[in-house]
Design a protein with these regions (language model features):
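N-terminal secretory signal peptides
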Residues: 1-22
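Acidic, glycine-enriched loop/beta-strand segments at the rims
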Residues: 48, 61-72, 346-347, 411-448
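Active-site gating loops and adjacent loop-to-helix segments of metal-dependent hydrolytic enzymes
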Residues: 121-152, 159, 194-221, 285-312, ...
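C-terminal cap of metal-dependent C-N hydrolases
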Residues: 428-485
Length: 513
């Protein structure tokens, strides 16, 4: 399919490695700022000088509804150009670089629809105190970040995302502009969901006294205008940047911190610019109680009353929903972003089976601390099986359902289902190379099932976004990984030492220390 030079990105393709076989052998089927601190001197843009196409030869191609064995997949520019018999594809692309696909499987890149990358700092703490967090720290860790250290936390989260199979990530936070350049240079496909609120007296579920002691919300036109201006400025600067790899969506932070006017403005912005929008929804009991107390309705009904629900919206969490909420979300076609691993940490299993049945498309996200969508797929499968009341337990959902949620489901949420989410000719070349020759993956009656149930993120050998390798042979190409890890560890140790010096951390059920 012809594309203009503006649409055609440059590509960072590496020389053939020693394990790759010759074209003749393959045809014969023989044999088996802050960003500057964090990225390698020869980062992605410096590497992106080759114009060669790539053929993954004699490989397995996996999508949610099909597995094709011993085929080739060709990448030309930023698109998948062909899938078919290896000899035919190699003859069609005689100048392409050849990637030996024997013992490998190609999957669509995973899409993380809900991440808070700066919260990477809270690893080893935020998982174990419930939600809202019951630990009353004398000082909040994020308040101790200095200068560009917050961008450091964001970027270490992006590094984890790449290593665990993410190719598209939705960063949901306020002030994303501070980290936008660093995120763009990671090579990930990014959606910057700039989060805004206009309540001047309700801090949300993480406020020191919690929502239970909150007073009636007061809304500030000034805060609303400032938030909408941030969205507009971020959109103007970044939407469509990096050959379309960067998108900007508006986000209302929380139902309890949003006025009707803010909700309407966020949706209007999304419709004007033909993008999606997002919100945290029904993530805690205090949120539900607060909305009923001060607005007279549960959170989904409040959003519906003010025209916020709909198929452009992907709502994160939906943990505390009743039958009426589920029906309302389903009728509106609202997409639910399911953060299964974090939900399990919180001790809550959202009624995903009921939401599916009601008509809600499901996507996946990670939320805080970790950015591993592979883990999310496995936890989502197991927790949904446990929560269902099927006559024969353990049949639903299937691994194919989980892959669809994490790929095509995410593509629908970010309004890019025509170009992302599956391995099809004409779609973007956002893909993973899975090494199937691992002790925990062989033998395998169904390779996708084996990977979801038994696999590890380290099985991912290479990943590609827009036809460019961002990880190859388990080496991330867009960052100085060793330096990044060392810097993040140093900063984290300093901050947690200061937190513990300010007051003890009481672990539930354990002695104070």
């Amino acid at each position: 399919m012809p594309r203009s030079p503006i649409d055609r990105p440059s590509r960072a393709l590496q020389p053939r490695n020693a394990a790759d076989l010759s074209r003749r052998e393959l045809l014969a089927g023989a044999g088996a700022g802050a960003a500057a601190l964090l990225l390698e001197p020869r980062g992605l843009q410096a590497q992106a000088t080759s114009s060669r196409d790539v053929v993954f030869a004699h490989t397995t191609v996996i999508t949610a509804d099909a597995v094709q064995n011993d085929v080739a997949l060709a990448v030309a520019g930023d698109r998948i150009a062909a899938i078919g018999p290896t000899d035919q594809v190699l003859k069609t692309y005689p100048q392409a670089e050849v990637y030996d696909g024997r013992g490998k499987a190609l999957l669509p890149g995973l899409i993380n629809c809900h991440a808070h990358l700066a919260q990477t700092l809270a690893r080893g703490f935020n998982e174990d105190f419930g939600f809202p967090n019951s630990a009353r720290l004398a000082i909040q860790p994020n308040s101790l970040l200095r200068g560009e250290e917050e961008t450091l936390m964001v970027t270490i989260g992006a590094l984890e995302a790449i290593r665990t199979g993410t190719t598209t990530i939705v960063e949901n936070s306020g002030g994303i502009g501070r980290h936008a350049a660093a995120l763009a240079q990671t090579g990930l496909r990014c959606v910057f969901a700039e989060s805004v609120r206009d309540s001047e007296n309700v801090a949300g579920p993480m406020s020191p006294d919690g929502l239970a002691k909150s007073e009636a919300p007061r809304f500030s036109p000034r805060l609303r205008d400032e938030g909408l201006q941030r969205i507009t400025e971020l959109f103007t600067t970044w939407h469509g940047a990096k050959q379309g790899r960067i998108s900007v969506f508006p986000a209302a932070a929380l139902a309890e911190t949003a006025s009707p006017e803010l909700l309407q403005a966020v949706r209007a912005f999304a419709e004007k610019h033909d993008v999606g929008y997002t919100i945290h929804l029904s993530q805690s009991r205090p949120e539900v109680d607060f909305m009923v107390r001060w607005h007279g309705v549960r959170p989904p009904a409040f959003l519906d009353k003010h025209g916020f629900l709909g198929p452009r919206l992907f709502a994160a969490h939906c943990r505390y929903v009743d039958q009426a909420d589920v029906a309302l979300l389903g009728r509106s076609g609202t997409i639910v972003s399911h953060q299964a691993a974090m939900a399990a940490n919180r001790g809550v299993i959202p009624p995903i089976a009921l939401l599916r049945a009601a008509g809600c498309p499901i996507a996946n996200g990670t939320d805080n601390n970790t950015n591993d969508v592979f883990e999310v797929m496995r936890v989502a499968l197991l927790t949904e099986r446990v929560s269902r009341n099927d006559a024969i337990p353990g049949l639903r959902p299937q691994p194919e359902d989980m892959l669809e949620d994490a790929t095509l489901g995410g593509a629908r949420a970010v309004q890019q289902a025509t170009t992302l989410g599956s391995l099809e000719v004409g779609k973007k070349a956002d893909l993973l190379v899975l090494d199937t020759q691992r002790a925990h993956l062989v033998p395998a009656g169904r390779i996708l099932s084996a990977w979801i149930h038994n696999g590890q993120p380290s099985d991912i050998e290479s990943s590609m976004v827009d036809g460019q390798f961002i990880m190859r042979n388990r080496k991330v190409l867009t960052m100085d990984e060793d330096r990044l890890i060392a810097d993040a560890d140093r900063v984290g140790r300093r901050i947690w030492t200061e937190v513990q010096a300010a007051g003890p951390i009481a672990v539930p059920g354990r002695p104070r220390r």
